[in-house]
């Protein structure tokens, strides 16, 4: 995806929208711009969600929402206001994470929020903020990566490796040998980051793996979902997965991984996300659902994939129905999923245009 175009369009206050379209189903999270939603369940049972939005003089902020009733309703409880993202300096693709164990001086339960900050006029960075009060207030922590040139760093994602280290995954455009690749760095304290290592990096310069999402399975194995763009043909930007036994070693970076598709050949392209149910079931969603021949499938914007263990992917209805999503930074773009503690329900947040504004909607449906 051309994320820099997205950032610049938002800074300019200009949104390219369809002429007329029915907005997504579900409830509105906020009644103005809400991009790149994320949702997590905390150890205390509360659900937190975040979106990127813009206020004032094109100030990019992270809006933090809380649900105390299993996702039936949300209330804004906090705001991440990074001065480096103020005055049109650019903000994109934020993530939200709760530490399940202490990392350095940060206790279990510390919240982390990170996003891509900057645009083409200065080196981009992945800036991390932390909260010790369940998302009410936030303070700057560190950068897990800073660009060495004017190319982009995108889509930060956190995980805790088997050895207890905090890992930051991201998409990197700064290497001339790769149009884009997936990278990871680790930290023992969340402040100092080290050992930048590729996780997905094609031997073809123009290939663009991106948008990593990492989850730990009940078995202890780690699973990463991502897209690979730049390949051309019907599988351009198709969704893939790969596994790691320890949350750091992901196999050969040049291997594309496993294509995410159903037994009858349907697959997702663009902006996939991944969720793991407590019972071990896996759920994925992508922006566009395609048929085996590459045509857009009838359930596009209204479908999730689910599978149990080593089974095959099958389709189920998506809680939020987005009408005919297409390759664009808003409709059904990187829609996060959260499965209930009993593994029976799934909460989805998905964005779509409403009267020319990209907004985020949420709803809950069956998880299988």
Model-based region annotation:
Residues 228-229, 236-239, 264-311:
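Loop/turn-rich, solvent-exposed surfaces of beta-rich toroidal or solenoidal domains
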Residues 57-64, 121-127, 176-183, 232-241, ...:
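Structural motif
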Residues 24-25, 65-78, 129-141, 186-195, ...:
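Asp-box/BNR beta-propeller loop motif
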Residues 1-23:
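Secretory targeting and sorting signals
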Residues 61-64, 73-117:
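Blade-loop segments of beta-propeller domains
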């Amino acid at each position: 995806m051309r994320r820099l175009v997205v950032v610049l369009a938002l800074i300019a206050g200009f949104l390219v929208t369809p002429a007329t379209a029915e907005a997504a189903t579900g409830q509105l999270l906020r009644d103005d711009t809400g991009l790149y939603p994320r949702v997590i369940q905390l150890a205390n049972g509360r659900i937190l969600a975040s979106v990127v939005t813009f206020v004032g003089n094109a100030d990019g902020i992270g809006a933090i929402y809380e649900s105390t009733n299993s996702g039936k309703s949300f209330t804004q409880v906090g705001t991440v206001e990074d001065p480096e993202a103020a005055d049109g300096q650019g903000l994109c693709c934020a993530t939200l994470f709760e530490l399940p164990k202490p990392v350095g001086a940060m206790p279990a339960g510390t919240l982390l929020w990170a996003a891509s900050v900057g645009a083409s006029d200065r080196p981009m960075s992945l800036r991390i903020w932390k909260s010790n009060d369940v998302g009410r207030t936030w303070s700057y922590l560190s950068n897990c990566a800073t660009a060495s040139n004017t190319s982009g760093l995108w889509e930060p994602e956190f995980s805790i490796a088997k050895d207890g280290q905090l890992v930051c995954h991201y998409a990197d455009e700064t290497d001339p040998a790769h149009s884009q690749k997936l990278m990871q760095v680790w930290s023992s304290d969340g402040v100092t980051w080290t050992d930048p290592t590729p996780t997905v990096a094609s031997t073809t310069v123009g290939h663009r793996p991106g948008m990593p999402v990492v989850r730990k399975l009940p078995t202890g194995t780690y699973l990463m979902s991502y897209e690979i763009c730049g390949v051309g043909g019907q599988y351009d930007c198709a969704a893939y997965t790969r596994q790691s036994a320890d949350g750091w070693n992901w196999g050969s970076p040049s291997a594309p991984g496993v294509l995410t598709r159903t037994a009858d050949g349907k697959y997702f392209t663009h902006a996939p996300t991944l969720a793991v149910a407590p019972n071990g079931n896996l759920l994925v969603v992508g922006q566009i659902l395609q048929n085996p021949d590459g045509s857009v499938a009838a359930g596009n914007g209204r479908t999730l994939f689910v599978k149990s263990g080593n089974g095959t992917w099958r389709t189920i209805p998506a809680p939020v129905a987005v009408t005919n999503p297409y390759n664009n930074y808003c409709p059904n773009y990187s829609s996060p999923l959260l499965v209930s503690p009993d593994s029976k329900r799934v909460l989805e947040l998905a964005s779509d245009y409403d009267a020319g504004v990209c907004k985020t909607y949420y709803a809950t449906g069956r998880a299988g």
